[in-house]
Amino acid sequence: MSGGKGKAGSSEKASTSRSAKAGLTFPVGRVHRLLRKGNYAQRVGSGAPVYLTSVLEYLAAEILELAGNAARDNKKSRIIPRHLQLAIRNDEELNKLLGHVTIAQGGVLPNIHQNLLPKKSGKSAKASQEL
């Protein structure tokens, strides 16, 4: 009677996800399903979703780290779209990657043109010192 499931002699392991095997947090299985359903190609290799998932996870971590720094600089504990905007636009590579992306409620970067700034002339500085 070897047909039943018994505890003795069972060598079944708990299944590990492809995300866990790759050491990722983002879901590899979901990315694979989306690649198959998206009609990007007739066939999808087994390594492609793992690679794409790792790239997506890295980009998300990079953006969130910079946005967290921007939130901390503004003395806030919650990341808002403004912090994402500041993080992306102040980073050269992320700005190049997401240059044509509009972030809702992101605002604009603070920038004052040089011609509009008050001029530092020597006469006004000397006159104020004499008084």
Curated annotation (Swiss-Prot):
Marked site positions, Not ubiquitinated: 119
Source organism superkingdom: Eukaryota
GO biological process, one term: DNA repair
Subcellular location: Nucleus; Chromosome
GO cellular component terms, semicolon-separated: nucleosome; nucleus
InterPro entries to which the protein is assigned, alphabetical: Histone-fold, Histone_H2A, Histone_H2A/H2B/H3, Histone_H2A_C, Histone_H2A_CS
N-acetylserine modifications at: 2
Any one GO molecular function term: structural constituent of chromatin
Region annotation (Disordered) ranges: 1-22
Alphabetized UniProt keyword annotations: Acetylation, Chromosome, DNA damage, DNA repair, DNA-binding, Isopeptide bond, Methylation, Nucleosome core, Nucleus, Phosphoprotein, Ubl conjugation
PTM description: Phosphorylated to form H2AS128ph (gamma-H2A) in response to DNA double-strand breaks (DSBs) generated by exogenous genotoxic agents and by stalled replication forks. Phosphorylation is dependent on the DNA damage checkpoint kinases MEC1/ATR and TEL1/ATM, spreads on either side of a detected DSB site and may mark the surrounding chromatin for recruitment of proteins required for DNA damage signaling and repair. Gamma-H2A is removed from the DNA prior to the strand invasion-primer extension step of the repair process and subsequently dephosphorylated. Acetylated by ESA1 to form H2AK4ac and H2AK7ac.
Motif [ST]-Q motif: chain residues: 128-129
Gene3D superfamilies, per database record: Histone, subunit A
Signal sequence region: none
Glycyl lysine isopeptide (Lys-Gly) (interchain with G-Cter in SUMO) cross-link, chain position(s): 126
N5-methylglutamine: modified positions: 105
Subunit structure and binding partners: The nucleosome is a histone octamer containing two molecules each of H2A, H2B, H3 and H4 assembled in one H3-H4 heterotetramer and two H2A-H2B heterodimers. The octamer wraps approximately 147 bp of DNA.
Note in the entry: In contrast to vertebrates and insects, its C-terminus is not monoubiquitinated.
Function: Core component of nucleosome which plays a central role in DNA double strand break (DSB) repair. Nucleosomes wrap and compact DNA into chromatin, limiting DNA accessibility to the cellular machineries which require DNA as a template. Histones thereby play a central role in transcription regulation, DNA repair, DNA replication and chromosomal stability. DNA accessibility is regulated via a complex set of post-translational modifications of histones, also called histone code, and nucleosome remodeling.
Record comment regarding domains: The [ST]-Q motif constitutes a recognition sequence for kinases from the PI3/PI4-kinase family.
Family: Belongs to the histone H2A family.
Name used for this protein in its record: Histone H2A.1
Organism of derivation: Scheffersomyces stipitis (strain ATCC 58785 / CBS 6054 / NBRC 10063 / NRRL Y-11545)
